[in-house]
A protein has these predicted regions:
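Phosphate-end processing signature that detects enzymes handling 5′-triphosphorylated RNA
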Residues: 1-242
């Protein structure tokens, strides 16, 4: 059971400039503590069906959304700690199930269907999802630099800042070097506020006063939109030539 984690929370996203981030970091210092890992490089593989069903459902704004991903902290080795995550969103509430294992075992389970992760309730949910979404495979690599903080008085409150968000659709392997195409401008950061209940008043007041507004920004979703746009443009060029 120690290798399983279950989250239920609300997540709110904001796109910030470098100055906005700097000012907020200074303001929230009395309320938040830096995560013990400090600044991390987070590497992810998002899994999807051959027709990209999961991400299409997500960006179409369905009430129920689901994502399956493999995550490591930094470039992976076979024995690196890895997390297989099943992330569901229903009516704005995020439910995340996570299994911790070694990277090589995670790949064998997700890509080859081998029985390499411990049996548990979360494993059963993963098995069901893998059977439901036939032909599921790695679709997009995403990495980013993350700074994470948690509340001094409320440990369910987490605030993260993601920068240097990179994506690619080739070399879909977390043991490969960290590289890809950028999603954000150089001075931008994606802030995520994660709460188990209501947002604290000090944070609500700050966001309101500084006119910081929520966005529905999705890293995988924006990468997918770029893929579709470029495919359509390429198709249009070919039709024009013919």
């Amino acid at each position: 059971m120690a290798n399983q984690t279950i989250f239920k929370r609300y997540e709110y996203k904001y796109l910030l400039t470098a100055d906005q981030k700097k000012d907020l970091l200074a303001y929230m210092e009395p309320y938040m503590k830096s995560d013990k890992f400090g600044r991390n490089t987070i590497c992810n593989l998002y899994f999807d069906t051959p027709d990209d069903l999961l991400i299409r459902r997500s960006i179409e704004g369905k009430v129920y959304k689901e994502k399956i991903r493999l995550r490591t902290y930094g470039r992976a080795k076979d024995d690196s700690e890895a997390f297989i995550e099943l992330k569901k969103k229903y009516k704005k509430v995020v439910y995340k199930r996570r299994v911790r294992t070694e990277y090589a075992d995670a790949v064998k389970y997700l890509c080859q269907g081998e029985d390499t992760i411990e049996h548990s309730q979360i494993r059963r949910e993963l098995d069901y999802a893998m059977q439901l979404y036939q032909g599921i495979r790695p679709a997009v690599y995403l990495s980013y630099e993350r700074e994470a903080f948690y509340g001094r008085d409320d440990h369910e409150l987490r605030i993260t800042f993601d920068q240097n968000i990179l994506w690619r659709t080739t070399q879909l392997d977390l043991s490969a070097p960290v590289y890809g195409r950028p999603l954000l401008e150089k001075d931008q950061a994606l802030m995520e506020i994660k709460v188990g209940h209501g947002m604290p008043l000090w944070l609500v007041h700050y966001l309101t006063e500084h006119k910081m507004y929520r966005t529905s920004y999705s890293k995988y979703g924006n990468a997918y939109r770029t893929i579709v746009t470029e495919k359509n443009e390429s198709k249009g060029e070919l039709e024009h030539v013919s």
